[in-house]
Amino acid sequence: MLFLLTGDVQIGKTRWLERLAAELSGDGVQVAGVLAPGVWRVREPHEVPGERGLAGEGRFEKLGIDNVLLPGGERVPFARRRDLALAEGSFDPTSQSASAQLAWEIADEAIARVNAHFDRIAAELAAVPAGAPALPGEAGSRGYA
């Protein structure tokens, strides 16, 4: 099953998903996948959004995006704003994100790490016998929420 959660910037979508995943896990539901929280910093009072490439609105500047691999909780740096990656020297002009001309620098190794995580989940699901419950008391499901 696939759900899409949408909303404005900085309204708490990721925090809500993190709480939901923790609650489901606490109830014995296996939660697997990837959460993608932003990496933010508080703007200085004199900084204006849009000035010097300051991304995001309001009090916070978005610097990057991490991935949290569930169910284990491993946090993987995933994307860095391209202007920051260029300034820091971490931009790779041969990366997939550079080829796609994204506003984010995403290391090919980070993409491979997340893809390997999804491959592992798919393999674990394939090994679950048909009809095995995913949710407590639910028959006919496949082991994950």
Regions found by a protein language model. Name each.
Residues G12:
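Conserved glycine(s) of the Walker
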Residues L2:
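Walker A (P-loop) ATP-phosphate-binding motif of ABC ATPase nucleotide-binding domains
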Residues W16:
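Hydrophobic positions on the alpha1 helix immediately C-terminal to the Walker A/P-loop
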Residues L5:
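Hydrophobic anchor at the beta1->P-loop junction of P-loop NTPases
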Residues E88-A145:
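Phosphate-binding/switch loop-helix module in NTP-utilizing enzymes
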